[in-house]
A protein has these predicted regions:
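Short amphipathic alpha-helical face segments that pack within enzyme cores
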Residues: 84-90, 224-231
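A generic structural motif
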Residues: 216-219
Length: 241
């Protein structure tokens, strides 16, 4: 399994191994450049920072050292990390804009004088072609039969780039149950079910809109969250045509 295939099929194992080969310090530093662990600057009061954990954060807030298992969790966006939907939107927009991190704004309409995009920063990669590699993988999340959101693809339809995800809100810790048994037990209480997420942008190759869908306790990103994102993108494109 390579990186592209891991993104398309959402392979946790690949990212477990990648995280342990990197380090929590490098992962946290790179994620910070996408806007995590800071407010986005949108014109709203009370915006949250989220949590971007590292060794210092865990020692200060949990009172424990950082373990390899924590890095493994961070590698798939689980564990101590928390984000806001707006932070996710800024991060996904950075991929769409090939590294440019844009400050989100609330506006009535767009004009060049007052609402031109404000670039907060730029993520510099050693190989800029990696942005296109990421975009192709996110397109295949939808267009490939192996993609976790392949149910969205319609031949001849507008091309979208996206990624499904789930946010686990209930830890698995029952020693006397298998993982499957514990998940089935968790599902009995709807409020403990995983959140369903989908992030994406389109149309590719000239994206105009980024969408982030979070369905609390929705469980299935591909069948619940992703179709909502597609409807939003379709409606936006139709309104501009």
């Amino acid at each position: 399994v390579n990186l592209k295939k891991a993104i398309i099929e959402s392979s946790d194992v690949y990212f477990y191994e990648l995280a342990t080969k990197t380090s929590v310090d490098k992962i946290s530093s790179f994620l910070k450049s996408f806007g995590f662990d800071t407010i986005t600057g949108i014109d709203m009061f009370g915006e949250g920072f989220g949590i971007l954990p590292n060794r210092k954060w865990k020692l200060g807030n949990i009172g424990e050292s950082w373990f390899v298992g924590d890095t493994v969790n961070l590698g798939i966006g689980q564990g101590y990390i928390t984000t806001t939907p707006m932070q996710l939107a800024v991060a996904v927009s950075a991929i769409a804009n090939k590294g440019k991190v844009i400050r989100p704004r609330i506006v009535e309409k767009v004009n060049d004088v007052y609402t031109s995009p404000e670039v907060k920063g730029e993520i510099l990669l050693k190989d800029i072609s990696d942005w296109m590699t990421m975009e192709k993988a996110m397109v295949d999340v939808i267009e490939s039969w192996q993609g976790t959101a392949h149910n969205l693809f319609v031949e001849g339809d507008l091309r979208l780039a996206g990624k499904t995800g789930t946010a686990q809100i209930k830890s698995l810790f029952e020693d006397d149950l298998t993982v499957k048994e514990e998940y089935l037990d968790i599902r009995k209480d709807k409020e403990k079910r995983d959140h369903a997420l989908f992030v994406g942008y389109g149309p590719v190759p000239d994206p105009k809109l980024t969408v982030v869908i979070v369905i609390e306790n929705g469980e299935s990103a591909s069948t619940i969250a992703a179709p909502i994102a597609k409807k939003m993108l379709n409606s936006y494109i139709k309104s501009k045509s």
